[in-house]
């Protein structure tokens, strides 16, 4: 693992830890955002293994889907989870007065981001 990949994985771990703490404090919108970022950092680190990167979130998600999930290098369902996590992050960060993430959203995303991180770590260890 390169130093840049390690830094991204460290950021992912910190984001996941923050997501858990925030969920425990019933701050579900912010928890969802941190879970998304845990997944996003893992996606970026994984793409670097193929010498790929993007300057945008949508570009990173697209490259991840094309070169890692659809190519069979990583499970396809984690790409779908990353897409769904971004949608929830946007809802939590920018949603209106009646648009908030639920406790269930936060709990599901924490579990998914922990699994995403484990899969990314195994991929990067190859």
UniProtKB/Swiss-Prot annotation:
InterPro entries: HEPN_dom, UPF0332_toxin. It comes from the Bacteria. It holds the Pfam family HEPN. Belongs to the UPF0332 family. PANTHER family: UPF0332 PROTEIN TM_1000. This is UPF0332 protein glr0978. The lineage of its organism: Bacteria, Bacillati, Cyanobacteriota, Cyanophyceae, Gloeobacterales.
